[in-house]
Amino acid sequence: MKVRVLVCAVLAIAATTFTPLAQQKAQNGDWPSYGRDPGAQRFSPLTQITPQNVATLERTWAFDTGDTAMQVTPLVIDGVMYVAAGDHIFALEPETGKLRWKFADQDMSRRGLAYWPGDAKTGARFYTGASNGRLIAVDVRTGELAPGFGTNGAVDLKASVSVDGGAGNFGLPSPPSIYRDVVITGGTNGEGAPATGRLYGDVRGWDARTGKMLWAFHTVPRPGEPGSDTWPLGAYKNRSGTNAWGFMTVDVERGLVYVPLGSPTDDFYGADRHGNNLYGNSLVALDALTGKLRWYQQLVHHDLWDYDPAAPPTLIDVRRGGRVIPAVAQITKMGLLFIFDRVTGDPIFGMEERPVPQTDVPGEWTSKTQPFPLKPPPLSRLTFDPAKDFYALTPEHASWCKNLWEKNQLVASGPYAPMPLGRDVVTFPSTLGGGGFGGVSYNPQLALVFVNVSNLGMMGRMEPRTDPKTGNVTYGKNSVTGGAYGRFWNPDTRIPCSAPPFGELVAVDVNTGDISWRVPLGIVDELAAKGFKDTGALTLGGSMATAGGLVFIGATADRRFRAFEAKTGKELWVTELDADAKAAPMSFLGRDGRQYVVIMAGGGHQLSRTKPAAGSNLIAFALPSK
C-alpha cells in the first residue's frame, strides 16, 4: 500500500533553522560513509582493478581490532581510515594499517560510523551509538568526545522514547544518517511482547552541533495521527519493534531520508494488534529537516514472520519510457526487490496485492493479501515441494533431512502462510532471508544492482501459553528443534535440507526489471571435496560494485572473499579469510597511487560453519607493487 501525505505522525520539537552547509561529495579515492554515498549505492569509481588483473590481487595488511563478530565497513576520508569495532574507534594509515589514534567507549555500533564534515565554527565529527543507548559524537581530528554535543559528547537516546520513565534496552547497531546539520537515528528497542518499560522505535533528528532533538517521527502512530486506524485503540502503548535497526539513506538533492522500518512486536503473534500495523514493515520517506512523512509503502501487512526490511534503501536511476526516473530499491527478507519512484513512492514496475492463507490461531488476525512486485520476480526460494526440492547430493545428509521431515510430520507451506496451531510447517524463507541487512550494490554505468540471497527455510508452529498469574492464554512460536527460529537444516552441520543453491548472487537490470544473471555464491567445503562445487553457501553481508567492472563480496559462510565480473557473473578471484566476512567491502585510492579493497573478517554470525567461528581482523588487498 502506497500513500503520499502532506501531514504525518510527527512531533515537532523545535524550529528547524540551519546554517547552509553543502553536502560534501566523496572524493573519487575516498569512502566517506557506509554505502560510500548517502544513497548507499556501494559503488567505487576506481578502475585500477579490472577483470583482466583481479586474479593477481594480494593481501597487503591486516589490522586486529581486538573485537569479534564485527560487521563494519571502514571509512576513508582525506587520507585516513576510520573503523568502529566493539569498544573502540580506530584511526589508521590506510596504506599500511598502522594505528594513528584510538577512542574507547562501551560497545559501539558494530556496523560503522557516520561522518559530518563540520563548518567554520565546529570541527568534523563522527557519530555512532553505544549499547547503553547513547549517541556519541567524536572529534575527527583528536579522537576525543566532541565538546558541546549533548552532555560530555553524548546524548541519551532512551530519554525521549521511554514510556512512563521505563528503562528498557535501546541501542544503535547501525550508524545514523546525516543530512546537512541533522543526525538521523533509528535504533533497536527489543522484540518481545508489549510490556511495562518498553521503548518506542521513533525515528528522530538531532542537531549535529548541540545534540538537541529537532523532530521525532512516530513509527507507531498515536491516536488521531494518520495510520492509527491500522491498530486497535491504545495498542501503541509499551509497543517496541517497528524500528529502524538497519541503515537509512538520504537523497541529498531532495532532502529526503528513506527509512526501512521493522516488525511490530511480538514478531510471531499479533492478536493484540489487529490491523495492518502502520508503519511496521514499511519503507517510509521523510523530510530530513522536519521529519514530516512524504510517502510510504508497506511491504508486509501485519507481520507474523519477522520479515522486516533490514537492508539499506539504495538510490538508483531507472531509464524507462524515454526519461530518467529517480528511484529507490529495497530488497526484503522475502527476496522481493521493490523498486519505487523515490519522489512519489509509486512502484515503477507495478505491484499487486495477492491473496494469502489465513490463520487458525484463536484471536489472531491476518491480512487477506500481501504486496508483491510485478518485476523483478522473487530472487530467492519462496516455496518447497518435498517431492522434488529435498537435498539429495550426499546420502548421509539426505537421510537426516528425510528423517527430520517424517519423524515430525512436517508440512510445506506457501508464501506468507501463518504458522498453524499445533503442527509444524516448513516456510521459505527463514528470518535470515532472502535478502539481508547487507542490501544491494549498484553499478550506474551498467544499470545493474547486485543482490546476495540465501535459500533457507524455517520450521514452526504456534502453541498456547498460559499466564500462571492471570490464567490468560496467548500463543507463541516454537519448532521441532526448539525455539522460535527453527531453521530447516541440520544444526550440527548447518547444511540446509533443501536442494541447492543455498546462496546466490543475482544481477537485476534496473531499466527493465529483468534478471540479467544469477550464479551460485559460495561453497560448502565438504561437499566441494566430493565434487559438488556449485552448491552456493548461506550468505549474510553485502557487496561492492566498481567502475572497473567488478563485484566484490564476502558474506558467505565459507570464509571466502570473491570478485565477479559485473557483466556476466563469472567468478574471477577468490581468497580465504581468517573468518567469515559478515560485512560489506569498500575500496579507496591510497596516497601511493594504489587501489585497495578492504573487508572485515568478523565472523560470528548465525550462519557460520567454519572454524574459527569469529575473527577480529580488518584485511586489505591490492594489486602487486610495480
Whereabouts are the PLM-identified features?
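N-terminal cofactor/phosphate-binding cores enriched in small/glycine residues
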Residues: 40, 44-119, 126-151, 155-158, ...
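N-terminal pre-domain segments of enzymes
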Residues: 18-47, 367-399
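Bacterial N-terminal signal peptides
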Residues: 7-17
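Repeat-blade elements of multi-bladed beta-propeller folds
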Residues: 31-35, 67-86, 108-134, 168-195, ...
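Beta-propeller blade signature
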Residues: 138, 142-143, 199-213, 273-292, ...
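Extracytoplasmic beta-rich repeat domains
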Residues: 62-73, 102-122, 151-175, 218-247, ...
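A structural motif specific to WD40 beta-propellers
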Residues: 60, 98-102, 144-147, 156, ...
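Phosphate/diphosphate-binding loops
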Residues: 312-361, 566, 600, 612, ...
